[in-house]
């Protein structure tokens, strides 16, 4: 079986030689490694007659629908009002066209399973990482050279791909297409994006060293990236993170309101970020989404959204309430189109955080007339929790003492993490109590069902085991929980926990079966009952593989041995039939 299916991401041509993935002994075809990291690389230019157009897609066999190409075209250029002269980097996210064949199979699914929930791929979306250049050029009719180099990927590794673009884009604009081919060939030599391993990624003479987090990592910690087999002299740069943004820089214009913003994101409230450029809008939206980590933000979010987006009508209609989505916009038109939205964040030009904004009060929505309105948060929302003055003082003190922005971001990240954990721990504790006891698991009965989630029962647990055990914040925690239980973020979190616990029950049931003397059981029962048992056990093995059940390898081997021993005790004609119906 190939390492992964060759579909939209990159199909090897017939007759091309396969290499082997040394650790797994699986065949690797050209562009398989590339497809693990990127879907494709696009160059978007400006044509006087056509407007924005995709000039190059690499590798050439990469598949994009016309709708996807149109979205990429408009999202890869700043709105004309942004006035982005020079080089600008930003990020966007867009829906994949429906009915597309998935390009990844079991191995990459396995990698995805080891990631923290907030880094798992969403198969319905692509990310676009943009390096846009606009410089004066009198030789061109328009008077400007305008072009974007865009990396399209399913992976939300913002910092990694931003770093890659910073390395390759300036040289690409000088050397053009042959250079792009060399870049893609380099990526096709990268190891798979295995969580938890130290990876060395060469790109045009530079070697990046990084580590992708795993779900086993303690939240809020970044394990030290240590050298494995590669000498220090060969490492050009070490990336401390693959996905994090500069939190403090993003929240600096509105940091008096960070706790309220955390509540709005947690509750999946409709939020729009109005910013002067795609760089500011995309970084702020990504910072908002990350502020409830390690919870996954389960609604849609668009770091940069334009009036040409295929979902423009869906998201701006006034015939229904605004959807649970976070939009980053720069076009002044949105100040009017989205003025019915309940929560609007206005971001000014992001400078290095040397000045603390003086504005403290939340502004009323009716005061937001245009995109030129003063920076601030425009909403009538009343937070459930009392304001934490300590974090504001701590950050203000950091500004006065000229504390590095990295340190300020670390303080802010730790604050958000502790707030989110204080909120989610009571829910985790209650949901864990819905799991049946191990003694209730019988090998001869179907695995027991999880108990039903009762909002009333959960609320009763908060009096003695609520967030007050880990947080000193006062306020209406009960009201916050009631609101959260109706949100898409709760729905996504609970579905994930349900799936995880159901798989644990299936795994425990499988272990219980393995601990039985199944051969002895078969000797006491009819041939029909024994054949039925064999088929059920084989289905259990298939389920364990298909659903990636958390079963030890020894348990699976033991079950295979049981199946084989039972079959060999049957008459020859039945042995032949059962041995042909799958591996025993």
Curated annotation (Swiss-Prot):
Q: Where is this region: Disordered?
A: 1-23
A GO molecular function term, named singly, is: guanyl-nucleotide exchange factor activity
| Keywords per UniProt | Cytoplasm, Endosome, Guanine-nucleotide releasing factor
Domain (dDENN) spans: 371-504
Q: In this protein, which residues make up the domain named uDENN?
A: 39-218
On whether Cytoplasm is a keyword of this UniProt record, the answer is yes
List each copy of the cDENN domain by range.
Answer: 244-369
Where does this protein reside within or beyond the cell?
Answer: Recycling endosome; Cytoplasm
Sorted alphabetically, the Gene Ontology cellular component annotations on this record are: recycling endosome
What's this chain's function? Guanine nucleotide exchange factor (GEF) for RAB14.
Entry's family note:
Belongs to the DENND6 family.
Q: What is this protein called?
A: Protein DENND6A
Write down the species. Gallus gallus
């Amino acid at each position: 079986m190939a390492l992964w299916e060759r579909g939209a991401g990159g199909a090897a041509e017939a007759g091309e030689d396969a290499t082997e993935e040394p650790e797994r002994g699986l065949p690797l075809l050209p562009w398989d490694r590339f497809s693990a990291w990127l879907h494709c690389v696009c160059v978007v230019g400006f044509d006087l007659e056509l407007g924005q157009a995709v000039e190059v897609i690499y590798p050439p066999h990469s598949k994009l629908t016309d709708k996807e190409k149109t979205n990429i075209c408009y999202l890869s250029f700043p709105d004309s009002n942004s006035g982005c002269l020079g080089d600008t980097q930003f990020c966007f996210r867009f829906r994949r066209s429906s009915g597309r064949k998935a390009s990844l199979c079991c191995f990459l699914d396995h990698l995805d399973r080891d990631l923290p929930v907030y880094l798992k791929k969403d198969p319905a979306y692509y990310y676009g990482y943009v390096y846009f250049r606009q410089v004066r050029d009198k030789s061109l009719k328009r008077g400007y050279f305008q072009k974007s180099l865009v990396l399209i990927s399913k992976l939300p590794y913002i910092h990694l791909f931003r770093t890659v673009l910073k390395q390759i884009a300036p040289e690409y604009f000088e050397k053009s297409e042959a250079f792009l081919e060399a870049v893609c060939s380099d990526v096709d030599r990268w190891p798979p994006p295995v969580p938890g391993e130290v990876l060395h990624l060469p790109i045009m003479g530079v070697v990046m060293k990084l580590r992708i987090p795993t779900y086993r990592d303690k939240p809020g910690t970044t394990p030290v990236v240590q050298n494995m087999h590669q000498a220090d002299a060969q490492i050009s740069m070490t990336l401390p993170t693959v996905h994090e943004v500069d939190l403090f820089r993003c929240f600096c214009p509105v940091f008096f309101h960070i706790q309220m913003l955390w509540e709005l994101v947690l509750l999946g409230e409709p939020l729009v970020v109005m910013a002067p450029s795609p760089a500011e809008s995309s970084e702020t939206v990504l910072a908002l989404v990350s502020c409830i980590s390690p919870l996954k933000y389960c609604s849609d979010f668009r770091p940069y959204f334009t009036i040409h987006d295929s979902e423009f009508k869906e998201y701006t209609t006034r015939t229904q309430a605004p959807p649970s989505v976070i939009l980053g916009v720069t076009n002044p038109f949105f100040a009017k189109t989205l003025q019915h939205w309940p929560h609007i964040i206005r971001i000014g030009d992001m400078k290095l955080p040397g000045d603390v904004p003086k504005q403290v009060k939340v502004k009323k929505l009716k005061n937001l007339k245009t995109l030129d309105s003063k920076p601030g948060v425009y909403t009538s929302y009343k937070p459930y929790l009392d304001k934490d003055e300590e974090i504001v003082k701590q950050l203000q003190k950091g500004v006065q003492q000229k504390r590095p922005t990295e340190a300020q971001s670390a303080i802010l990240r730790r604050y958000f993490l502790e707030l989110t954990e204080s909120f989610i721990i009571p829910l985790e504790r209650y949901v864990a109590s819905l799991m049946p006891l191990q003694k209730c698991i019988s090998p001869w009965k179907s695995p027991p069902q999880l108990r039903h989630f009762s909002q009333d029962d959960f609320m009763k647990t908060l009096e003695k085991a609520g967030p007050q055990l880990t947080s000193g914040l006062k306020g209406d925690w009960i009201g916050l929980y009631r609101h959260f239980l109706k949100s898409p973020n709760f729905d996504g979190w609970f579905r994930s926990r349900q799936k995880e616990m159901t798989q644990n029950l299936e795994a425990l049931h499988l272990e219980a079966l393995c601990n039985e003397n199944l051969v002895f059981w078969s000797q006491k029962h009819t041939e029909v009952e024994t054949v039925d048992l064999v088929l059920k056990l084989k289905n259990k093995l298939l389920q364990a593989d298909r659903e990636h059940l958390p079963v030890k390898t020894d348990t699976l081997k033991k079950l295979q041995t049981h199946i084989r021993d039972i079959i060999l005790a049957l008459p020859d004609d039945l042995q032949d039939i059962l041995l042909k119906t799958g591996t025993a």
